[in-house]
Amino acid sequence: MLGAGLLSAPLFAAEPARPGTVNYIEGAAFLDGRPLNNRNIGNLAMDAGDELSTATGKAEILLTPGIYLRIDSNSAVKMVAPDLELTQVEVDHGRVGVEVDQIFPQNNVRIVDAGVETQLVKTGYYEFDANHPEAQVFHGRAEVEVGDGKYEPIKNHHELALEQGAHLKTVNFVARGTGDDLYNWSSLRSQYLAEANNQIAGDYAYGAGFNPGWYWDPYAYDYTFIGMNPFYSPFGWGFYPWGGFYGAGFYGRGFYGHGYYGGGFHGGAGFSGGVHGGGFAGGGGFHGGGGFGGGHGR
């Protein structure tokens, strides 16, 4: 519940991240009907049964390391299981997007829409619409539970209607243009997270005992994912564990072909001293799908 998930706001670092941690909000967002603000970012995590909703706003929560769930305006999600072994979120109404930058076979990440469970299997970008129940795979692979222990796979650029009585067959869809606000916002968030990665990765990755996982950026004021090796997000933004990134893109729209190398927020804040002097040691590492490691020094 809210009281159990609300953590004290430290001066320099957020609490260690776990599935359900609120990573970003803009506009009107609520947890179990209580309004959220920027002080909750990184310091508030959803427990089982909690509902996060938006009005004229948006929100982003962390799932397992490397997976972000983004909640569109006028939407709501309920946390079913905030565990590393089973991470399950139900879309009550509205739309959500899920960016998967890292996933292991040991992970079991599921999105429930209209009572139907969809398991995310590969890295990529996914959207779910509870108002018109459907699962869309822009890039990646998902498996929809259709009953009797059977699953219907959804591949790149395919969607599946999730309403009862609908045809259990995926259909190809044409990726929507830049008018898709949720997609474009997710791409922008991915860009900002890549900038945060570029900003702090060198300070963390060169430290002793580095493990890939969630790491707190005190300047962007959110968690970003630092992996063991370089990778691209589904939107083409490069994440490099030793700093530096550039963009590519899958869909030829949004931010295709743009990006940065050596950009971000370097220069004005004396970051290296802030990290080490402020006790930013270790991190939210993730080992082979089994759990978090390390921790945030304070």
Per-region residue spans from a language model:
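Flexible, surface-exposed loop/linker segments and immediately adjacent secondary-structure boundaries
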Residues: 11-203
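Bacterial N-terminal signal peptides
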Residues: 1-8
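Low-complexity segments
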Residues: 171-277
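Extracytoplasmic low-complexity, disordered linker/stalk tracts in cell-surface/secreted proteins
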Residues: 265-298
